[in-house]
């Protein structure tokens, strides 16, 4: 999993999300969980802060842009996935001591891969086997980029994605699955 972090430049006077009132905050895109949906729900629920009412939202397009924007002083504050931040530090793109976290969320499930419910069971078995037997050590570039990953794990939508559904509900998003 990963966490959503609200970050500022290390030299920033901001110590808490409550201090963003009247400022501009960078998000990635409106469809991003950690780059918009989760921070919006958290800011509203925990700090009574709502975009356009209490602060001005801006969109960077992706987590890397938000991180670089804070790092270079283009954005005062941003919401990002810390897995992206950690990879940028490992690759030497940014120096860790130039960024400071003022909020970290609970852990969210990471990217999920699924299959259609009506696939032939034999094909489902082969797909699962391909994932669960993947050799993470066979590719040095993969190992460098995803240093913490050492296996795929099975997930259950009902339990493991509950936090994502709660965030969507807090943001007024509902699904009509048929």
List each model region and its residues.
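Hydrophobic residues within well-ordered alpha-helices
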Residues: 20, 70-71, 113, 127
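A bilobed periplasmic-binding-protein/Venus flytrap-type ligand-binding module shared by bacterial periplasmic
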Residues: 3-14, 108-122
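Short secondary-structure boundary segments
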Residues: 82-83, 117
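Bilobed "Venus flytrap"/periplasmic-binding protein-like clamshell domains
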Residues: 1-68, 75-77, 83
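Short beta-strand->loop
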Residues: 53-56, 89-107
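Second-shell loop/turn segments in exported
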Residues: 26-32, 71-75, 114-116, 149-154
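Sec-exported extracytoplasmic/periplasmic mature domains
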Residues: 44, 48, 71-76, 90, ...
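An extracytoplasmic/periplasmic, membrane-proximal ligand-sensing/linker region
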Residues: 114-115, 119-178
């Amino acid at each position: 999993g990963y966490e959503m972090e609200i970050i500022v430049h290390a030299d920033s006077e901001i110590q808490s999300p409550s201090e963003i009132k009247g400022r501009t905050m960078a998000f990635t895109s409106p469809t991003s969980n950690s780059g918009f949906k989760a921070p919006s729900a958290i800011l509203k629920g925990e700090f009574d802060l709502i975009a356009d009412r209490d602060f001005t939202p801006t969109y960077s397009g992706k987590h890397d842009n938000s991180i670089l924007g804070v790092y270079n002083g283009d954005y005062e504050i941003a919401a990002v996935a810390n897995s992206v931040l950690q990879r940028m530090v490992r690759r030497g793109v940014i120096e860790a001591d130039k960024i400071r976290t003022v909020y970290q969320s609970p852990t969210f499930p990471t990217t999920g891969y699924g299959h259609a419910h009506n696939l032939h069971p034999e094909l489902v078995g082969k797909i699962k086997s391909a994932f669960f037997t993947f050799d993470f050590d066979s590719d040095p570039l993969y190992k460098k980029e995803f240093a913490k990953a050492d296996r795929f794990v099975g997930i259950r939508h009902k339990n493991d994605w509950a936090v994502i559904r709660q965030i969507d509900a807090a943001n007024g998003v509902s699904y009509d699955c048929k």
